From Swiss-Prot:
Pfam families: TAL_FSA. Signal peptide: none annotated. It catalyses: D-sedoheptulose 7-phosphate + D-glyceraldehyde 3-phosphate = D-erythrose 4-phosphate + beta-D-fructose 6-phosphate. The lineage of its organism: Bacteria, Bacillati, Bacillota, Clostridia, Eubacteriales. It comes from Clostridium botulinum (strain Hall / ATCC 3502 / NCTC 13319 / Type A). GO terms for cellular component: cytoplasm. This is Probable transaldolase.
Length: 217
C-alpha cells in the first residue's frame, strides 16, 4: 500500500518527503484555507517537493465550473489529480475530464455504491472516509473492504485512497482491507514510526556503547 500525506502544509510535506516514504499528496479547500495561501501557489510548491500524484480540489459544485477549474488546475503540473466531490454534478465532470486524459480523485465517498459510480464515470481514484464513517457508527474499514472486493471481482482499475485517517490503526486496517493507498496526516505518519520498545532499545544501545567506549566516542 502506498502512502500519501494529507495536508497543504509545505513544511510537513517536506519533512515527510525526507523520510522517503511518500508517493503522493492530497489537499482540500479546508487544508488550503488553513494555510492562508493561494491554491495554485501552494500546489505548485508541493509539486516541486513530491514527484507523485498531487490531488487539488475544485471549489465549485456546478458541473461546467468544475470542468473549467479542473482543466485550469491540470495545467499547473503533469502530476496534478483533480479532486471532485461525490455528487451528480461531480460524476458528470469526472466523465468529461477523464475522457480528456485528466486524472481525477472522487472524494467524500461513504458507500461502496458511490465508489462504483465514481469508478464507472472514469475516476482514477476514489477516497472513502474512514474516520467520518466511524463517527456515525458505521465502521469505515468495512466500506473499504467492500470497495476493494468489488473492484477486484469486476477488474476495476480505479485505485482506493483510504482517507479521513486518524490513527496508525486506521492505516493498518486500510492496508489489510486492500486499499491501494492511505492518505495520512503528518502527525499520524510520525506516530507510525514510534514504539515504546524501540525507544527503550535505542536507549539501551547508547548506554551499552557509552559504558564500553566512553561518552562521545
Amino acid at each position: 500500500m502506498k502512502i500519501f500525506i494529507d495536508t497543504a502544509n509545505v513544511e510537513e510535506i517536506r519533512k515527510a518527503s525526507e523520510l522517503g516514504v511518500l508517493s503522493g499528496v492530497t489537499t482540500n479547500p479546508s487544508l488550503i484555507a488553513k494555510e492562508g495561501r493561494d491554491l495554485k501557489e501552494v500546489v505548485e510548491e508541493i509539486c516541486n517537493i513530491v514527484d507523485g500524484p498531487i490531488s487539488a480540489e475544485v471549489i465549485s459544485l456546478e458541473y461546467e465550473k468544475m470542468i473549467e477549474e479542473g482543466r485550469e488546475l491540470s495545467k499547473l503540473h503533469k502530476n496534478i489529480v483533480i479532486k471532485i466531490p461525490m455528487c451528480e454534478e461531480g460524476l458528470k465532470a469526472v466523465s468529461v475530464l477523464s475522457k480528456e486524459g485528466i486524472k481525477t480523485n472522487v472524494t467524500l465517498i461513504f458507500s461502496s455504491m458511490q465508489a462504483l459510480l465514481a469508478a464507472r464515470a472514469g475516476a482514477t481514484y476514489v477516497s472513502p472516509f474512514l474516520g467520518r464513517l466511524d463517527d456515525i457508527g458505521n465502521p469505515g474499514i468495512e466500506v473499504v473492504e467492500q470497495i476493494a472486493d468489488m473492484f477486484k471481482i469486476h477488474e476495476i482499475k480505479t485505485e482506493i485512497i483510504a482517507a479521513s485517517v486518524r490513527t496508525p490503526m486506521h492505516v493498518l486496517e486500510a492496508a489489510m482491507a486492500g486499499s491501494h493507498i492511505a492518505t495520512i496526516p503528518y502527525k499520524v505518519i510520525i506516530q507510525m514510526s514510534k514504539h515504546a520498545l524501540t525507544d527503550i532499545g535505542i536507549e539501551k544501545f547508547m548506554k551499552d556503547y557509552e559504558k564500553a567506549f566512553g561518552e562521545n566516542k
